[in-house]
């Protein structure tokens, strides 16, 4: 009987006593009824301790997940802001490119419209005017041709800078 009582005592020792290094089997003055009453109160204590621990772990997981969620949302907002700034810069760059292209096309149009008119005027002037007047018109035509060549060179530089 002593052996079975001893077995019962070691089976009913609470985990708290085991963790603290106390074992009910070491206490020779303890009776089986005391051990049984203590084991039932220890079980209730363990259950409340387990629920408290699980509630604490649950709260910590909730706080961690909320923190991660806030971090992810902040990162998404930063990505949105960065993308909006990039799109705005791209829009401004395209608008400037359109303006420059319009200026170049306008310059080409003016240069091309002045060239045939200038040649036509020279042709008419050669038939009607004296030789000195024709020489002046030819020098004027040369100046216009040089100006047109300069515009074409600027256009070439402009188009090369875009690529």
Curated annotation (Swiss-Prot):
* Low complexity bias: start-end ranges: 36-52
Q: Where is the composition biased (Basic and acidic residues)?
A: 23-33
Give the keywords, sorted: Coiled coil
**Coiled-coil region:** 69-143
The ranges of region (Disordered) come to 1-54
Protein name as it appears in the record: Uncharacterized protein At4g22160
To which species is this protein native? Arabidopsis thaliana (Mouse-ear cress)
